[in-house]
Amino acid sequence: MLATTHMLYVLIATCVIPIFGAALSKTVLYQAPDECRWSGGGEHDITLVCHLRTINSELENTNFSVIQPQNTVRLRLECNDALFFQSSLSPDSFRSLVELRDLTIEYCKLGNLTDGSFRGLQELRNLTIRTHNGDWSTMSLEMASNSFVEFRQLERLDLSLNNIWLIPDGMVCPLKSLQHLNASYNKIQDISNFYFSASLSSRKARVCGSTLQSLDLSANKMVSLPTAMLSALGRLTHLNMAKNSMSFLADRAFEGLLSLRVVDLSANRLTSLPPELFAETKQLQEIYLRNNSINVLAPGIFGELAELLVLDLASNELNSQWINAATFVGLKRLMMLDLSANKISRLEAHIFRPLASLQILKLEDNYIDQLPGGIFADLTNLHTLILSRNRISVIEQRTLQGLKNLLVLSLDFNRISRMDQRSLVNCSQLQDLHLNDNKLQAVPEALAHVQLLKTLDVGENMISQIENTSITQLESLYGLRMTENSLTHIRRGVFDRMSSLQILNLSQNKLKSIEAGSLQRNSQLQAIRLDGNQLKSIAGLFTELPNLVWLNISGNRLEKFDYSHIPIGLQWLDVRANRITQLGNYFEIESELSLSTFDASYNLLTEITASSIPNSVEVLYLNDNQISKIQPYTFFKKPNLTRVDLVRNRLTTLEPNALRLSPIAEDREIPEFYIGHNAYECDCNLDWLQKVNRESRTQPQLMDLDQIHCRLAYARGSSHVSLIEAKSDDFLCKYASHCFALCHCCDFQACDCKMECPDRCSCYHDQSWTSNVVDCSRASYEQTLPSHIPMDSTQLYLDGNNFRELQSHAFIGRKRLKVLHLNHSRIEVLHNRTFYGLLELEVLQLQSNQLKALNGNEFQGLDNLQELYLQHNAIATIDTLTFTHLYHLKILRLDHNAITSFAVWNFLPSYLNELRLASNPWTCSCEFIDKLRDYINRHEYVVDKLKMKCDVISGNSTQQMVIYPGSGEPASLPVVQCSQTLPLGLDNNFNYAEQAGGENASNATSTKMILNQPPKLDYIPILVAILTAFIFVMICISLVFIFRQEMRVWCHSRFGVRLFYNAQKDVDKNEREKLFDAFVSYSSKDELFVNEELAPMLEMGEHRYKLCLHQRDFPVGGYLPETIVQAIDSSRRTIMVVSENFIKSEWCRFEFKSAHQSVLRDRRRRLIVIVLGEVPQKELDPDLRLYLKTNTYLQWGDKLFWQKLRFALPDVSSSQRSNVAGQSCHVPINHASYHHHHHVHQQAMPLPHSVHHHQQQFMLPPPPQQPGSFRRQPSLHQQQQQQQQIRGNNNTTQQQQQQQAALLMGGGSVGGPAPQMIPLAGGIQQQSLPLPPNQQPTPASRNLHM
């Protein structure tokens, strides 16, 4: 047993220890320094990447010895390219990395490489040093001749982007295994130091570069290539010397390059080529000479290059004298010839005869005006012929003879006015034909011979109609481009045989009409451009195109638009710059559409609703319209929204639910809305917008909120402010009269809770009626105050009138008044208790009047007054009790009056923040001045103390003296300096009596001054207590009476108790036996509010009510009046959702109105009215006005809306609270008996559908059946499958994207990578040149625009 256990332990140790050791060794082996990380795939393809600031600079020293040498095979060092500090490599820097095979140094600003910089790297195979020293124009990389002496096995050396000026002698000679050398993008002028010349090498007994296979010297400063300069490179296959400044090549510059296959001399300054240049390079396969100035070609210069496949002579100055039959003799294997952008004006008839293998011929951008007959007859393998941008005017019958394998023919940007009918007879394989930008007046009949044609471009011609049948027979045509012609009418049948057509571009024509059904046979169409025409209607054009995903009809004259005009699979739609006034949705199919990008900008839209916008939309442009109203919940249930643009419209206000979104998941970005550049009014309905970006995830992110400016409905200063800078009490609405819902005396003249604006005044309120501003400024009131000043006024402006005097208790009852302006009103007298009852008054402005005295009781009761302005009056006397009870006074202005003496130190509050006393004729009595100065010294809030002066009367003259001089500042007037007897500067004959009053002592007391007078008691304390208690009791009784409804609602919502509720009176005998708790009557346009807000809260809340919704639960086809009567009889309450939509739609229908009136005339107590949004009173029906007066009236958005609604509804039983909403609908409706009526469009359109809230519905007593038919709609899952199938069919390959770009974006041949199709407001643009979204539409450019 013990032996068995021992063996088991040994076995476990044998298995576990190697595994643990391997894991541990791998962890230890692949440890990287702090600045480095390992990257790559397998164990044998791993690279150590180090991100350094610099190497051995003044900032830091770099120690590469910390890198593990045994596992580091590949090392990449990247310095910070933002730091301009020089790096350096010290000798033996990499000596420890003996296994290193690949070393890359990038962005390290090395100035030199010393002899021992790379000592020890004997196994290195690849070395890349790119310092990017070109970032420093004065810094270059200098190398020692022995810098690379260690690299005996180096195969690849990259020294590009180092700003190298000079190569050390024989630098690469020690590199016996070097195969690839890249020294591009430097400043090298002379390559003789490379010792690549056999003659120089033999002279110095050194042979260098014999193993090189590729040499890249492009983008340097070489000006010439002498004879045999590269003759030692016998194995060289690729030579790149492009982008230099070479203007001279020696006759035998390529001597010794026997293995050369590819030579690139593009972008130099060559004007000619030596005749013997290619004498020893007979293996050449590719020659690139484009972008030079070659104007001479020696005859037969290419004659011995039998292996040549590619010859690129584009962008030179060759003319017809040097491009002739002798030029291409011997090039029997040439496959691509590029002669574009030269000066060729004519071609010999047999010029291309030696080129039997030619496949691609480019002759664009020359001066060719005619093509000899049969010129291409020997090019039987040619598949691409580019003749764009020449001067060809006619294509004759034999011009294209022999091109039986031609696939692409580009003749665009010529002067072609005629093509022979048989000119394309021999081009039967042609697939892409470009004839745009010519002078064709009709579609060429020659097209009848190219039945395999896939793309045809005849844009930018003068074609006015499609008459011949040549184009109608192109059954394989994939894309047709006819933009910028003169087409005026498209008749039905023109495109019928083009069954493969997927892209159609008819933009920028003069089309006024397209016959309905013209495209019904082209079911494969995916993209259509009709922008820039004169179409007035698109009805019947696109409904039969199930695969259409892209449609541009902008810049036309459309006045009507309906979603029934487009297929449900359309994903991108542009209708901007038309005359559309409404986004119609007659069949209510917004939930079935697939639109993701929709541009309806620059139209005449005035209103948008939820049905105006498809539910699938992601990007929506509605800018530059005339939109003045956005219906509530317009953007609700649009889950894919990412951006909405509403700038430059006519919006003046937005209610909170106008931008309401469905709740957004936390992992999704909130949609971005742009709503700026509208004439907003900062009224009471817009205060919510200021903080919308701080709301929950049911409101969008307003990206331009800080740029929104609005006009204040009421402003006593600037009327335009930035929205985010507006104060909360700036958001006001104007009103003439208003009566609160709980006010019961509105029909009587004397009604305190009725807000009625006085004559000649303007009145404003905020959303919650917290602010109530009454402005009667300069209203020409004489002697008396305006009548009926609202009791709830918070700001009252009466300035600029003529009142003379204000009676006692003039403002009694205005207990909420905070600001009162009475300035500039010629007031002479304030009676006692003038402002009594203004318990909340904070600001009182009485300046610039004619007050002469304050007798003590004028401001009694203003316990909360904070600011009192009395300047610029004629006040001479002030009673000592005037200000003593103003405990919260902060600002008091008494300047510019007639006060001579007032003991401010005894009778002013000590908690002031600002006091002004200047410009009064203060007495210079030393007793007064000493106390006044002491008061000023102790209180900093006397802000005008330096301006205070007193008057000294001496004889017939009055002298002013400074009371409180500034420190260190000379006074312009003498300063009062009191001694024990006289003020300083006055003689002993000065009469103090004269100082007080006049010329003699008898007048000395003429100015009234009451000092230290004992306070008067106006009321007996007991009487005050009794009166206070009585007032308190009366206020409590009044509050209970006024707010009795709120109290009942609160008690019901909190405790379930109904106060003052007579069960015998309020409950019908059979009420509890009724099937439903409430029948909800509403407009179909408000269905979203009912289904998403009202019904879920009532049916699924704590008290689960059973509701009957007519849009959901009524049998389709039933007789509506009788059905409504039965629904109301079966319900304990009737909820009527009154909105502008309800008034303009359902209530105006005779049957609906009659049914409601007949049932509700005697049952008004059972009716609950919910007002949704603003309902214009003038448009209300008289019956509705009566309903609103006599029934429970709830405003959506009220803070206690749900509590009041539940209070108005009957109580539900406890058993019902636990039931699931809707389970009382026992009898399911027989859907087979449904009947549905529509005036169907001439094309069959899918009927709208909605997802039912309940799976079961109740059955009302059967109404009279109407004949008709009902078509059950597909489920949501089926719709998603259909949309996915449509999207799947629209997937295109890269080749199709190339064709789309050419057909939709511009004319010309297709070359290079396909531009990506990017849907923007202006159409699909090239990704490299995107247009700004929603720019003013302009005619499409020929190349960049679609």
From Swiss-Prot:
Q: Extracellular compartment: which residues?
A: 22-1021
Annotated region Disordered: where? 1235-1346
Q: In which ranges do the LRR repeats occur?
A: 97-120, 124-146, 151-174, 176-198, 209-232, 234-256, 257-280, 282-304, 306-330, 331-354, 355-378, 380-402, 404-426, 427-450, 452-473, 474-497, 498-521, 523-544, 546-568, 570-591, 593-614, 615-637, 638-661, 790-813, 814-837, 838-861, 863-885, 887-909, 912-938
- In what residue span(s) does the TIR domain sit? 1074-1209
What Gene Ontology terms describe what this protein does at the molecular function level?
NAD+ nucleosidase activity, cyclic ADP-ribose generating; receptor ligand activity
The positions making up the signal sequence are 1-21
User: Does this UniProt record's set of keywords contain Transmembrane?
Assistant: yes
What does UniProt give as GO cellular component? apical plasma membrane; plasma membrane
Which InterPro entries does this entry report, sorted A to Z? Answer: Dev_Immune_Receptor (IPR050328), Leu-rich_rpt (IPR001611), Leu-rich_rpt_typical-subtyp (IPR003591), LRR_5 (IPR026906), LRR_dom_sf (IPR032675), TIR_dom (IPR000157), Toll_tir_struct_dom_sf (IPR035897)
The record's PANTHER family line, in alphabetical order, gives: FISH-LIPS, ISOFORM E (PTHR24373:SF370), SLIT RELATED LEUCINE-RICH REPEAT NEURONAL PROTEIN (PTHR24373)
Under which name does UniProt file this protein? Toll-like receptor Tollo
Organism, as annotated: Drosophila melanogaster
Lineage, broadest ranks: Eukaryota, Metazoa, Ecdysozoa, Arthropoda, Hexapoda
